[in-house]
């Protein structure tokens, strides 16, 4: 039995999230069908971060076990020939059996991209979020500082989250502007359901002047989702990096999405 790690990129617009759900189109379901065709036996895939419906990934990492022998090249090109065009396998690598895409990960990084203009984006509407009021990224950065560190993030946890604990550790939050786009970049050890989208909702309210930067601290301390801001739409969210111990020697991919410089 061999264990294979994969790098995966996908546009999540047409999918009901990563995780397999009966009678629904999911990224995991499509990847497993494609790999099963290459392996000639059923393949079950485990990923680093189970993205929600409509959320994208430029650097998802997954693994599967197989009794089939294929070269790394064959796994990549064989799977891609069986996948829909909005999912791509970027790389494949044989790994030791102690590697686990989810539990071996040390950190994940997400980017939420907001098109900040009074007129909504027509062409990239499925690829970025939108806010029509001017956003002050310095105010957003000031609010974000209250969220860095290890905290109970119950106020940022979506309903139905199955995590055993709401405690997470945020290593870094960076807010920056690229022309008309404001990028909210968050790195943490792990994330709760809707956590990044709820953080983005709070920071956008701060950036638009609706709330003061210290409102982020008020929301955090409340430990009550009802005290938080709106949950921003999923289309602007990307899983852009998963970090692992260097001994696994996994390929490094550039942070995405590709349309950011």
Swiss-Prot record:
Catalytic activity: uridine(38/39/40) in tRNA = pseudouridine(38/39/40) in tRNA
Active site per the UniProt annotation: 52 (nucleophile)
Annotated keywords: Isomerase, tRNA processing
Entry superkingdom: Bacteria
Keyword Membrane: no
Keyword Isomerase found: yes
Signal sequence interval, chain numbering: none
Family statement: Belongs to the tRNA pseudouridine synthase TruA family.
Listed name of the protein: tRNA pseudouridine synthase A
Organism whose genome encodes this protein: Coxiella burnetii (strain Dugway 5J108-111)
Lineage of producing organism: Bacteria, Pseudomonadati, Pseudomonadota, Gammaproteobacteria, Legionellales
